């Protein structure tokens, strides 16, 4: 992402950041780049020349109540408009325009209002789904919110397939109601492994995953809002952050994000140590 362009004296004046209507890898990613762009422009002294707009298909900015108030405050403090219930329908790159639909419900009536926004810089989050082979193999959900995108139909606690008891699924492709992040996968791996071994031995899978996920939302260069939560959308804070008020952005969480998580992933998780 060329943030140096967003904060430069070049022809970038209107920047648009979008979030989509499907589950996707790291739900906080569109928020991070938006806030980092704003802070970078301030650091370069060009913030007064830049208009940022955030568009999301969701009905709220963030669906974890413990962290939402502060996140809303940050957007308001930085004068970044939040546009809810809006879907991207197309992008005209030659005209530098995004075609949106505003979706509203009045009673039982669904009202769809199309509109167009001009941009100089666009950060677009596309809709995401499971690979076609998952859908074609009949492994995905066939009903409910996760069916349209064919995420694998597993029990949210044991991670065992609802129909095929010899299949265990985890990570981005698993159809479970939590965020698709490496932090979530880190907690899912031992659950999935132990339950798979139990199945291979003809035993019942007893290990249970509580939906833990973490989304370190980078709010500026030096601070992170460390969102850790479970299936109930309640805080599930790890040590040592359990001794700190994590409803606010933290410098210590920035250190974790920048200097610890990457080596933990590549040297620890990928080698089975973390």
Describe the role of every protein-language-model region:
Residues 39, 185-211:
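Internal hydrophobic alpha-helix adjacent to the cofactor/substrate pocket in enzyme cavities
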Residues 13-24, 54:
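Short hydrophobic beta-strand segments
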Residues 8, 118-187, 197-198:
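FAD-site-proximal beta/loop scaffold in flavoenzymes
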């Amino acid at each position: 992402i060329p943030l140096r362009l967003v904060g430069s004296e070049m022809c970038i004046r209107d920047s648009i950041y979008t979030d989509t209507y499907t589950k996707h890898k790291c739900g906080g990613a569109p928020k991070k780049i938006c806030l980092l762009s704003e802070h970078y422009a301030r650091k370069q002294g060009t913030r007064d020349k830049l208009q940022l707009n955030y568009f999301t298909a969701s009905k709220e900015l963030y669906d974890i109540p413990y962290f939402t108030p502060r996140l809303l405050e940050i957007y308001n403090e930085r004068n970044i408009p939040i546009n809810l219930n809006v879907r991207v329908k197309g992008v005209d790159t030659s005209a530098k325009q995004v075609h949106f639909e505003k979706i509203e419900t009045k009673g039982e009536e669904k009202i769809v209002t199309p509109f167009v926004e001009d941009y100089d810089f666009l950060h677009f989050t596309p809709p995401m789904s499971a690979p076609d082979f998952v859908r074609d193999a009949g492994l995905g959900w066939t009903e409910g919110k996760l069916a349209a995108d064919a995420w694998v139909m597993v029990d949210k606690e044991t991670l065992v397939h609802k129909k095929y008891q010899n299949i265990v699924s985890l990570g981005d492709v698993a159809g479970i109601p939590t965020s698709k992040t490496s932090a979530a996968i880190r907690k899912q791996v031992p659950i999935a492994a132990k339950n798979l071994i139990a199945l291979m031995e003809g035993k019942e899978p007893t290990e249970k995953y509580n939906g833990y996920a973490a989304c370190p939302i980078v709010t500026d260069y030096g601070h992170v809002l460390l969102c850790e939560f479970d299936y109930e959308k309640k805080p599930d804070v790890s040590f040592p952050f359990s001794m700190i008020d994590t409803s606010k952005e933290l410098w210590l969480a920035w250190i974790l994000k920048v200097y610890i998580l990457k080596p933990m992933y590549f040297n620890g998780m990928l080698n089975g140590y973390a």
